[in-house]
Every structure is written in C-alpha cells, then in structure tokens.
Amino acid sequence: MFFAVITLFPEMFEAITAYGISGRAAKRDIVQVTCINPRDFAEGSYRRVDERPFGGGPGMVMMAEPLAKAINHAKQLASQAGCVHVPVVYMSPQGKTLNEQAVQQFVDYDGLIVLCGRYEGVDERLIQHYVDQEWSIGDYVLSGGELPAMVLLDSIIRRLPNVMSDEQSAIQDSFVDGLLDCPQYTKPDQFEGLDVPEILKSGHHANIEKWRFLQRYQRTLERRPELIEQVTLTKQQKKWLSDEQG
C-alpha cells in the first residue's frame, strides 16, 4: 500500500518506517511510506510555508500554494507506483472521528495522501480544492497533524494482509467486531496474590472462547455501553449470553 505524507517534519515518521509492526511491513515492501516536505515547493530563499491570517488573529496559517504543489507531487508518485484510488486525507480536529470501521475502509484503497497541518491550520481553499476527507483522532488539540497521521498509518498497516505474524491477533483486537478486548494474562501464574483464571489454563478451547467472549461483552457493557447497540452477535454468541443470564 502506498502512503505519501505531507509534513514539515519528515523525521518523525521514522517511528512508523523503522520500528514495530509498521517498520517490518515497510522493510518487507508491503507498504511504501514517502514523506514530502512542503518547504521543498515554497518560493524564496526562506522557503516560507506560512503567513498571517486574513482578518487578523493569533498564529500563522499554512499557505495553499506549496501544499498544493506537494500534493500534486504525491499524486504523481502514486501514479508511478500504479495506484489509482488514492484519496487526500487531512488530519484535523474538525474531521470525523477515526474508528475501526473507517480504518477497514482505508485498507481497501490503493494508498493515501495524508496532509499534516501545523500552526493555526491550512488555508481553507486548499481544503476545498484538494482534500477528499478530514479525520480526527479525538476531541482535543495537538501541535500538529503528524501524531494523528502516525495513528492513522499504524492502524491501517496492522490490518493489511500478511503484516501481522498472527492474523488472529488482529481479528481479536478491540473494536474489530465492535467489542473491547478480553483480559490477557501471561506467566507467572500468580502475581502479588492475583491468580490467572483457571479456565485459561484448562486447555479446553471451546470453554476458553466462550469465557473470552463473555469477558469482552461485559467489559464493553461496563466501559463503553454505547458500543453494544452496534454489535452484531453470532448465533453462538447469543446462546452463550442466554446461558449466562440464566
């Protein structure tokens, strides 16, 4: 999958390309992550990419022209890589909140061009003419779009085929089917007076599967009850709930 990131701080994305699951995917050429600095497309000796906002106010606004040139360059790279469906995504507090359903849709694209804002944001005309989607990672403000972009890339990359060493691990992650994850345990059997649940050591896989589902359902009900209404249960899961509720 092709990713082009428009950012003033390309070095930050070594966290994606050099480490962990996403780093392994990059080394295996499952993903291609290219960072494009809009300063390379700015005019003048200072390579300025920001200006004061019209109408006054604090801070600076990223200028449309260098960003547009950077996006067009990214589109050329995507085309050279054989990618057709490559929308431009702007990471913004005004965007829709990212969730697992959106991530799964991104997985089906050929690639993404991700625009990272800074300062007070970007010129609205750039958004109107070049941005296809705006996404947020939550209702809070960060210094720029780089961290949200890394969240977006990591969440997509781990869902791509052949990336996870254990495909079942990705399937069982929180939110994949609408439920939170179940409690996880490893050695030792006892820690500060707390024991691993006996059922997890029983070797009875059907009972373990049932226990894990019930734990996930109960945890979601307690911590994120609004998610329960969106969950589609299998016939077996409905039976487990019915048996548990008596």
Curated annotation (Swiss-Prot):
GO terms for biological process: tRNA N1-guanine methylation. It is found in: Cytoplasm. It comes from Acinetobacter baumannii (strain SDF). It catalyses: guanosine(37) in tRNA + S-adenosyl-L-methionine = N(1)-methylguanosine(37) in tRNA + S-adenosyl-L-homocysteine + H(+). SUPFAM superfamilies: alpha/beta knot. Keywords: Cytoplasm, Methyltransferase, S-adenosyl-L-methionine, Transferase, tRNA processing. The gene is trmD. GO terms for cellular component: cytosol. Pfam families: tRNA_m1G_MT (PF01746). Its EC number is 2.1.1.228. One of its GO terms (molecular function) is tRNA (guanine(37)-N1)-methyltransferase activity. Specifically methylates guanosine-37 in various tRNAs. CDD domains: TrmD-like (cd18080). This is tRNA (guanine-N(1)-)-methyltransferase.
